[in-house]
A protein has these predicted regions:
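Gly/Thr-rich phosphate-binding beta-strand-loop-beta motif of the actin/hexokinase/Hsp70
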Residues: 2-25, 107
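Acidic active-site catalytic centers that drive phospho-/nucleotidyl reactions
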Residues: 14, 58, 100-103
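Short, glycine/acidic-enriched loop or turn micro-motifs at the edges of active sites
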Residues: 17, 61, 85
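Nucleic-acid-processing active sites and adjacent nucleic-acid-binding tracks
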Residues: 25-54
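Short hydrophobic/aromatic-enriched beta-strand-loop microsegments
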Residues: 31-34, 75-83
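Short glycine-rich phosphate-binding loop at a beta-alpha junction
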Residues: 52-63
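Anion (oxyanion) recognition and catalysis
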Residues: 72
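Long, charge-rich intrinsically disordered scaffolds of nucleic-acid metabolism proteins
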Residues: 79-164
Length: 164
């Protein structure tokens, strides 16, 4: 069935460590798949059947990347959305309840109403450099935290710890 001629289809994807919750609006289709290569492949096949206007997924700090790469490979129009914008949208429409299904529905509703600009995938080198910078910043933060902890230790203990 070609649903695209009848209405604009928007897909909301709530990403979790172990599963993806997917809601297709306005068709009221909800399903979950494991956040694995096979699960993502199955989700992409199902989503493509409905010819969506956009697929919106919240930026979750890397958990969403395999799904984004699959969307890009499948030539699906996708948006990596700022979680704060989705949270503010939820507040604006008065949605307070929270679970995985409702989050996926909310993201699809956000996609339909706000129609955020599609995301373009950065080159592999840019993504790699960004990942390295992020990891460096994490390590620097941890190093600062350890230095601060070392300063408040009793002298007899801190003197036995090698400085870095």
């Amino acid at each position: 069935m070609n649903t695209n001629t009848l209405q604009n289809i928007n897909v909301g994807v709530d990403t979790g460590k172990s599963q993806l919750d997917i809601y297709i609006r306005p068709l009221d289709i909800y399903f979950t798949v494991p956040n694995t290569d096979k699960g993502i492949t199955d989700a992409i096949k199902t989503i493509k059947k409905h010819k969506p206007q956009r697929v919106v997924i919240e930026a979750t700090g890397r958990l969403e990347m395999p799904f984004i790469l699959a969307c890009d490979k499948a030539k699906l129009p996708y948006v990596v959305a700022n979680p704060l914008r989705i949270k503010r949208f939820a507040e604006a429409i008065g949605q307070r309840a929270k679970n995985d299904r409702l989050d996926a529905e909310l993201i699809a509703h956000y996609a339909e109403r706000v129609q955020p600009e599609l995301t373009k995938l950065k080159s592999e080198n840019i993504r790699l450099m960004s990942d390295l910078v992020t990891r460096r910043n994490q390590l620097l933060t941890m190093q600062t935290m350890e230095r601060n902890r070392l300063q408040i230790l009793p002298k007899n203990i801190s003197s036995t710890i090698t400085r870095f």
